[in-house]
């Protein structure tokens, strides 16, 4: 489903609550302009208010995989993610136990070329892998980082069966991410 709202197209995905935003790019001989975020647009489309409280940015090289991360309970985070430079495969996994898409994932290529963004509601694990030589990844969160509530799922969990688009020998993960549990052993 496509809805064109002012300077941005908003698409529903196969997973309820995850939406793709595609800003309109205005270019001329000076460069380009786009509206990357508009609170009322997202709130109106979702039917509830999202109040982002923290912006984060990471720089990573090709093959770096960060994820799959989430925060538990009242510290869960909704995120609006985008790529400022380069390209990534972005993945959201539905961890909402009352959801008809529990345990399913949605993936999309986000890049500085396509300008697409992904809104991920609370109750999801999130991760991405860098497909380009390097990438600058930016994300807004509606809840602060809370170390005691952080958790995750191993990237290559057989139940989730995520295609990361790169072979395992090209992936770079932190020691911490390599020690994450599998989906079936999660304690939510």
For each predicted feature, which ranges?
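Non-catalytic, conserved peripheral segments adjacent to functional cores
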Residues: 2-113, 132-134, 141-188
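Short beta-strand His + acidic residue motifs that chelate non-heme Fe in jelly-roll/DSBH
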Residues: 118, 126-131
